From Swiss-Prot:
Gene ablation phenotype (knockout): Mice have a high rate of early postnatal mortality, although surviving pups have a normal life span despite decreased body weight. Knockout animals have impaired synaptic vesicle recycling, with an increased number of clathrin-coated vesicles, and impaired clathrin-mediated endocytosis of synaptic vesicles in neuronal culture. There is an up-regulation of Gak, but this does not fully compensate for the lack of the protein.
GO biological process, any: regulation of clathrin-dependent endocytosis
Domain Phosphatase tensin-type, chain residue ranges per copy: 80-247
Name assigned to this protein: Auxilin
Region (Disordered) residue spans: 19-41, 467-801
Origin species: Mus musculus (Mouse)
Amino acid sequence: MTNPKSGVAESAGLACSRAAAGENRMKDSENKGASSPDMEPSYGGGLFDMVKGGAGRLFSNLKDNLKDTLKDTSSRVIQSVSSYTKGDLDFTYVTSRIIVMSFPVDSVDIGFRNQVDDIRSFLDSRHLDHYTVYNLSPKSYRTAKFHSRVSECSWPIRQAPSLHNLFAVCRNMYNWLLQNPKNVCVVHCLDGRAASSILVGAMFIFCNLYSTPGPAVRLLYAKRPGIGLSPSHRRYLGYMCDLLADKPYRPHFKPLTIKAITVSPVPFFNKQRNGCRPYCDVLIGETKIYSTCTDFERMKEYRVQDGKIFIPLNITVQGDVIVSMYHLRSTIGSRLQAKVTNTQIFQLQFHSGFIPLDTTVLKFTKPELDACDVPEKYPQLFQVTLDIEVQPQDKVIDLTPPWEHYCTKDVNPSILFSSQQEHQDTLALGGQAPADLPPDHPRNLGQGGFFASLCWQDQKSEKSRCEEDHAALVNQESEQSDDELLTLSSPHGNAEGDKPHGAKKPGKKQQEPAAPPPPEEVDLLGLEGSDVSTNFSSLAAPPSNSELLSDLFGGVGATGPAQAGQAGVEDVFHPSGPVSAQSTPRRTATSASASPTLRVGEGATFDPFGAPAKPPGQDLLGSFLNTSSASSDPFLQPTRSPSPTVHASSTPAVNIQPDIAGGWDWHTKPGGFGMGSKSAATSPTGSSHGTPTHQSKPQTLDPFADLGTLGSSSFASKPTTPTGLGGGFPPLSSPQKASPQPMGGGWQQPAGYNWQQTQSKPQSSMPHSSPQNRPNYNVSFSAMPAGQSERGKGSTNLEGKQKAADFEDLLSSQGFNAHKDKKGPRTIAEMRKEEMAKEMDPEKLKILEWIEGKERNIRALLSTMHTVLWAGETKWKPVGMADLVTPEQVKKVYRRAVLVVHPDKATGQPYEQYAKMIFMELNDAWSEFENQGQKPLY
């Protein structure tokens, strides 16, 4: 159907109208733009008559219509791009005057979120004529987009910037902020992560906001999570702290000779995962000055049996030194590519001016090395050693360092903020540990967990960041962390002024961390007794059985009444006794005036093993010989004289040892392996729930009379005694299921409930309530009859839970978990993944998850490759296993995959390293596929 608006159709219509209706009708048709659907051959000559006067109009209409179409299409594209980026800018205010963002691009690029026009509009709307941009990436753009206020720094990728450049940029930023209180600095690199973060962190140190790298890094993690600072970045932040200290340290200019490099043990980078073929590159800044890479066949391949890698270097360096080691492998077996490729094993970077003059060895452990992102390829105790020698003569330098003759005493940190309140909030935020940082102490003390509180090894206090200013190059006596960067074999003390990161320099306020103060004695239960200074180290042997029983029933031994009134007698169930690795003096009550409503922790309401307060002359077994009442039985009045021992988790600021019997959190679980419940300690054969707290206890002269009826029929007709408030030890019998049975006029509750009965008559039917009953000490703790154990299946099945909860807290601090239904890692592999996720880049972790179980399986990798491609990749279409049956199909799909992920096509892109890793895994799998003869799937 002809479009009446088309220029060609309009001209044809004009010719037909002129031939049919004459000159006047032709003019009317021309003005109206009408067209006739009928064209007869006899009137064809009219077309040629029209050309003379209508040719100009023909091309004019074509031009106008084309212009309108292009304008409409362009406006639609611009609107779609604006809607895509609007409100989705990668833009972070670290402070009100320091801004971090990702790279702004001129055109539409899927890999970048920020468009130059959007960023410029945003900055002009808020900081017009008061902002300058610092481009840290080697990639550039038109500076006119930001009014020509762009500083091109061109920092290298995947390494720390030179110390000279880092200091100079910080000084430039400070001068810009000093010119006008409204000025702001906008910092960006390719992704707005590592390079931008080290500059902002160095700026915090430059402005004297922080004197150590730790708070600066924590603030960056809080403001912009996932910054991904490498050990070299942290090392250079430490250098900045030394340069800007109260008594600044000035790096020397003496050359450094690297004699050799030793790596031990041998990492696993070859296809067999039993060695590597290494070579080493040495760079000064971005310039490579030495490499040991030669012909592939002439290079030595080290195996695990060799124990270490030794490569002589004998190269002299000065300034920012980078040492990188690579594994060389050949892809000659591949038909697609016949060339040699490399994989980085590690990289380290340091400044030679911070090496002490008498240093001969530099040692780097795995946490102090860059690019160690695949833990499976590095054996345990992996370390790198550099044999070095510092030359005695200074080397003449061309450029004067920017820190020479620069005084930072007048620098005010308030220049980074717009208000005093913002300054205080930022300082508080820098003192908090970020959520995504790995904890310094991964061992988590469970609530009331006894074994979790034991000192299995010496715990050393975490070194402050101030003491870490030069710790990068000396051996430290403390535990290693991510911020301790280098260790040396040189002695700690040196009389000369040249010191490394962490070394002790003259005039530097630095000293060894003092011993932690003794834990504050806090009277959590309001006992306010007299202080006791018992020498816990004098306990030479564990107490005997008689001493255990004496302490169990409230006594302190048989040595005399003088010890009975002493509050600091060692309780064998307390960690300060012989079984504890820590000794903490305790306060014990001298009166029964504790608050009856005080609850410290969840399980501290009742401690059956705590010694009750009593006069010095009181009989040890007086609570069992006199007439029982609710006011005299410590087992029936848990709040009358509470135990001074509470859970360690009740308050984190006080070091209080947990109770070994009541602190295992067994008071909330059935089948606890203990003796702390009311039922087990006082009346195991009473009511099905134990003795009510308001009922008087029958008088007896035998404290063990309650144990005499353990084998009676009444005991055999009910399930295991439920655990009481203290987390008790039920009678030793097979695990039974709770079943409702009428016993003593009450209804039995399932075992393990936190219970307190209010009934007043359940003890009238107890068979042992009569004093004439003789205790039976020959009781047999036999299992419940089979028929009895099957009764409770209809109500509550607790057998499985009972077994699972018995030893739940024994190994909780080591990452083991007894409950399968709880969240968290249940296998070693999951725990390893959880640790890897804390330190590893998410993209590289995604690669590991992709190849897990599919190593060198070309079909499995190709069929799942769509799950690991970077965002925005649309060329690759997912394939199924049905498309990879024959070798020809595999070859075709593999070639198509290589065209998508080849590293040469990703040069300069942020996903270049990511594409390289995918390509190498596919290449390994293809080589394995060829070596196996390219067999079909079936």
